Amino acid sequence: MVLNLDTENRKMQDGNNDDDFDLEVKIPNSIFEKLKSIEALKARESQMCVSGKDDSIPTCDKNSTPGMITQRSCVYGGARVVLMPITDAVHLVHGPIGCAACTWDIRGSKSTGDKLYKNGFSTDLQEKDIVFGGEKKLYESILEVNKLYHPGAIFVYSTCVVGLIGDDLKAVCRQAQEATGCRVIPVQSEGFKSFNKTAGHKLACDAMLDYVIGTEEPEEEHPYSINIIGEFNVAGDLWGIIPLYEKMGVKVHTAITGDSTVAKVASAHRSKLNIVQCQKSSNYLAAQMEKKYGIPSIKVNFFGLDETTKSLRAVAEFFGDEEMIKRTEELIKSEIKNLRDEISEYKKDLSGRTVAIYSGAHKSWALVSAFGELDMEIIMSGTQNGKPEDYQQIRDHVCEGTLIVDDASSMELVQLLKEYKPDILISGAKEKYLSLKSGIPHCDFNHDRITAFSGYQGFINFARVVHTAVMTPIWRLSRK
């Protein structure tokens, strides 16, 4: 059996007993050795391609192939990670207790103020609730958490079970809001609504648009105020971005939703500009805010020195203030000057090393420039929930011969790591131990990390973590 990833002929062909891919860049025979017995392999063939042959991208945005155990999340999980960083809100899960395991530390967002968002709340539906309905239990739960915590808002998340039994989430939330005077927001996030958790991201954005944004006025308006959309303050990333804009003379009104409050998000419609971390859900929210409130938006990326510099200049150029532009250039010069020597030291060991990325759709291409600044080469990039536009971005950023993968299973990922032998894998915690057991260094760039990677200082942190992972002596000893 021969697997051919050539875009002119993606069909399964009969051949000898060894499995291989026919490519301009030949991939060794053993990549899918352990997958021979899986009938679903044919359906997975088109979800991998090699950049540079033409403008092709992997088949994506589809149901996971039956029998291939992937690591995707659900729609509820997608909604939860977007809204969870709102620090003074209660996040109440209407469903079985197991769904409440998706809590604040799934994304690890940090806060300078309220810590209420770190508490977990669930209606803990039981068998009798499934039979007789859970609306009464939900109503009583909302009243109880409001009495105990007096939150800025209560987000109520619907789960699969609730969608099946037909509880009227909106009606209960409306009644509870009238009874408590607290903002009670339904999030119709039944997990089975889509195979792709990004549908949950959009539902979370809709909840903010329908019930939060535009409902309050800011304490004061600033002529150069911005919102940062798609920044969730994982490991304190936001705190490496805000000071840079403040030095330029720009006021960051709020991030949506990292380290935010209900009041800040509610008054975000008065900001003069939205800057958008390039994720599909973030672009959707920015587009809706422009349509509804006339706020323009620009895309930014704070991973790496060059991308951070571009993001600062883009905002200064948007406002067109000559003094701001001058301050921005002075700031950029000062920041890079202070980091140049340290980066050079890391590059001595990292130059020429190879990297595999299996992460969120945005990071799978946004990190390419950052690794280029360390003279490292991307040889594989993939994501679990990428859309066509995400893979187009990956294709446009990586070098010819890079393998691009959609929705890889653990077995596939292990085989690809063994064949490509990258010097480091950049991914999340779910892939961490696959990498380490394969003898390949790992860097966590997803929600579980504890080190900030955004902005200028964040890039130094990133380079240090990558350098430490690659140069740890255990890898040299284990390979012997």
Swiss-Prot record:
Single annotated GO MF: nitrogenase activity
Keyword Metal-binding: no
Name of the protein described by the UniProt record: Nitrogenase iron-molybdenum cofactor biosynthesis protein NifE
CDD domains from the UniProt entry: Nitrogenase_NifE_I (cd01968)
PROSITE patterns according to UniProt: NITROGENASE_1_1 (PS00699), NITROGENASE_1_2 (PS00090)
Biological process annotations from GO: nitrogen fixation; protein-containing complex assembly
Annotated source species: Methanococcus maripaludis (strain DSM 14266 / JCM 13030 / NBRC 101832 / S2 / LL)
Organism ancestry: Archaea, Methanobacteriati, Methanobacteriota, Methanomada group, Methanococci
InterPro entries: Nase/OxRdtase_comp1 (IPR000510), Nase_comp1_CS (IPR000318), NifE (IPR005973), NifE-like (IPR049939)
